[in-house]
Swiss-Prot record:
This is NmrA-like family domain-containing oxidoreductase lnaB. SUPFAM superfamilies: NAD(P)-binding Rossmann-fold domains (SSF51735). NmrA-like family domain-containing oxidoreductase; part of the lna gene cluster that mediates the biosynthesis of diastereomeric piperazines. Lna and lnb clusters encode sets of enzymes that produce overlapping sets of previously undescribed metabolites such as piperazinomycin-like metabolites or morpholine. The lna and lnb biosynthetic pathways appear to be part of a signaling network that controls the formation of sclerotia, a resilient overwintering structure. One primary function of the non-canonical nonribosomal peptide synthetases lnaA and lnbA consists in the reduction of L-tyrosine. NADP(+) binds at residues 12-17, 38-42, 59-60, 80-82, 138, 162-165. Belongs to the NmrA-type oxidoreductase family. It comes from Aspergillus flavus (strain ATCC 200026 / FGSC A1120 / IAM 13836 / NRRL 3357 / JCM 12722 / SRRC 167).
Length: 334
């Protein structure tokens, strides 16, 4: 163990993204991990503490609490929960307001390397036709952090479509029933609009890969400085992903596109599904580009996963990203 272990502090460490980052970093004896949470007594906080993480209680709107939490940190990973109810309050604070406080506090605390979970400038990329508030806010925070020039390195990362979303039985009927409930013809049918462009959907195993991708950045932060990293495990069309599922389970499954465009997607009046609908609008209007103006790519994530696997001394087979086929095989194959 290195005598000068580097402290990496995670804002949002009890969530899916931050939790994955924490679990990966805690496997590396060269790093200390601190997790900022509003509830230090939550089950998620207790589990991370049991694994060796320091738990710091703090509210993202409190500059003093953030400064204290980031104190002594070499690096930081920040993911803000866009679904926090406080951001939907009429006339209330925005995600950018919180993000600015967090970034400013990290600068004041002397954080050298910041990895920030960001998003694309949706309104700009669609000429105002699609406005995804969460993505626009994250991008605004990213641009603010870049403009400061106060970090030795700053690396934004975008998270793809979580494969783990398929584990939620309660939402499966909204998407045709796949992968749990057969339709009246006996098929497990996945019904969503087309993605757009070449149908290169960016799938991500948040639990298997995301944390390792982020750790790979911290292992050589200068190499990735300023680069927008695509958080991707596999690039597959909806039709291919359903075929992967069918191949490993033996179940009848199919993809049925919702036509003619994204606007035909029925949200059933559920706000979270309104965001999903807008996502399809965004990707259809941008030719399938989810992370920004550039095409979706997996090579960077593949390199970062391998770097982490080598550093942690994992068997060679664990240096690879998780394919959609392997993800389904591990969770749905009999």
């Amino acid at each position: 163990m290195s005598p000068d272990r580097k402290l990496i502090t995670i804002f949002g460490g009890t969530g899916k993204q931050g939790g994955s980052v924490a679990h990966s970093l805690l496997q590396n004896p060269d790093f200390r991990v601190r997790v900022i949470t509003r509830n230090a007594q939550s089950d998620a906080s207790r589990k991370l503490a049991a694994l060796g993480a320091d738990i710091a209680q703090g509210d993202g709107f409190s500059g003093d609490e953030m400064l204290s939490a980031f104190s002594g940190s070499w690096g930081a990973f920040v993911n803000i929960n866009s679904d926090d109810k406080i951001f939907t309050t009429e006339g209330g604070p925005t995600e950018f307001d919180m993000g600015k406080i967090i970034v400013d506090s990290a600068v004041q605390a002397g954080v050298k390397h910041l990895v920030f979970s960001s998003g694309p400038p949706c309104t700009e990329m669609t000429n105002g036709r699609v406005r995804m508030k969460a993505m626009d806010m994250k991008n605004k925070i990213e641009q603010y952090a870049r403009s400061l020039g106060s970090f030795e390195t700053f690396t934004p990362i975008g998270a793809g479509w979580f494969l783990e979303n398929f584990l939620g039985k309660e939402v499966a009927p909204v998407f045709g029933g796949f992968p749990y409930f057969p339709d009246d013809q006996g098929y497990l049918t996945f019904r969503v609009p087309y993605w757009g462009g070449d149908e290169h959907v960016p799938w991500l195993s948040i639990s298997d890969d995301f944390g390792d991708i982020v750790q790979g950045i911290f292992l050589d932060p200068g190499r990735w400085n300023g680069h927008f990293v695509h958080g991707v495990s596999d690039i597959r069309s909806f039709e291919q992903v359903v075929a992967d599922f069918a191949a490993v389970t033996g179940n009848k499954a199919r993809f049925q596109p919702i036509l003619p465009t994204w606007e035909a997607f029925d949200t059933h009046g559920i706000q979270e599904l309104e965001d999903v609908k807008l996502m399809f609008g965004f990707t259809q209007l941008t030719g399938g580009r989810y992370f920004g103006p550039e095409d979706t790519e997996v090579d960077t994530a593949r390199q970062l996963k391998q770097i982490t696997g080598l550093k942690l001394g994992r068997p060679e087979g664990q240096h690879k990203l998780t394919s959609a086929r392997d993800w389904f095989a591990a969770r749905f194959a009999n």
